[in-house]
Amino acid sequence: PGREGVASLTNELMRWGTISYDRKAYEAETDAIAANVYLGNTFGATVTSEYLDRAMQLLADGMLRPAFPPAGFAVSKMKQLQTLSAAEHLPAVQAAIAQDQALYAPGDPRRRRATIETTAAISHADVRRWYASAFRPDLTTISIVGDMSPGRALSIVERYFGNWKAFGKRSRFNRTSLPQRAPTQRTVTVKSPSLAQSQVTLKEVLPMRLGDPDYAALLLANTILSGEGTGSLLFKELRIRDGYVYSADSKFDVDEDGATFSISYASDPKDVDRAQAAAVAILRRLQSVPLDDVELERAKALLAARRILPLDSYDGIARDVLTRTNAGETPAQADAFWHKVLALTPVQLQAAVRRKLQPDAFVRVILEPGA
């Protein structure tokens, strides 16, 4: 606490070279093998197979032996302060801050953010301490996808990352101790002189985490609401049928810390309330009337396509491996989950939406035209 922003500042400073190479020399080494190398809490390299060994050597050098030069720290800190100064008073930023304050109880770390004050308080030593505590092999997953054998990939990783050691105890965050705010309807309005229409977000915290039995059903419900573009339920009713909005979307996010569900739309100020009432009516219908089988099967097909199509690329395969590993999910568990998705019935989806969503408990944030 009091040093929010140290993580992003550390990421920025890692681009300033290593103990072996200064920033320009490091870039020259990666250019020599036509590699794209990026460093930070998310790190990686894209390179042809023949230069994988050298790319991994440079990647390990950047991750395990960053120089953290004082001059680079001063420049990076000033850059971050300038960015915060420019963004802090933007209406969209103020709206996002107000939303988090309304959604989460005092003491919840999700309310914390980098400010000019917290960033100004960060020292060069703070960056080194953060690096030592947060960049650890026991918090890292490395995925290699490409034209090589698994044995060669493992050998190269062990050669350059095998001596990476963790010091001290791994931090463990007790998520069950997070304070919970009782769900209740609130409205926050922020004026924006640059807007010609209102941008509205309805958002609520859901009583679930990754692995919840209702996860598959909520994914399908979100796909039905907004996953088919102009053919989605929200767009068809709020835009095409009623003419209340210019655009409409929904979002369902879930991880180990919790879950949120939101509906967002852009409308004329006079239609904000009517659009919300229509969106809430859709949710209530999903809670009270089972979907037609055809609609549910179409949503399943869309969701399955989003799962399968990215696996046609190296990046997609790598992201899939990392996502599953970070979630602690085995291939067998992933297969079981998708079998559950495909087997879900309209009645099961209806029951899950009724259990988890509270249409009367949205925090409403309105970014509206005005000075």
What function would you assign to each model-found segment?
Residues 1-54, 89, 110-113, 228-244:
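M16/MPP (pitrilysin/insulinase) zinc-metallopeptidase core fold and M16-derived inactive scaffolds
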Residues 106, 110, 141-209, 311, ...:
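An aromatic/glycine/proline-enriched structural segment found at the starts
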Residues 3, 16-21, 45-78, 209, ...:
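M16/insulysin-pitrilysin zinc metalloprotease superfamily fold
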Residues 141-146, 265, 294-371:
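C-terminal regions of mature proteins
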Residues 27-130, 296-315, 319:
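Acidic/histidine-enriched segments that form metal/cofactor-coordinating
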Residues 8-10, 30, 43, 59, ...:
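Buried hydrophobic packing residues in well-ordered domains
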Residues 100-140, 172-179, 208, 307, ...:
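Histidine-acidic residue clusters that define the catalytic metal-binding segment
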Residues 23-32, 67-85, 96, 149, ...:
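Acidic/histidine-enriched alpha-helical segments
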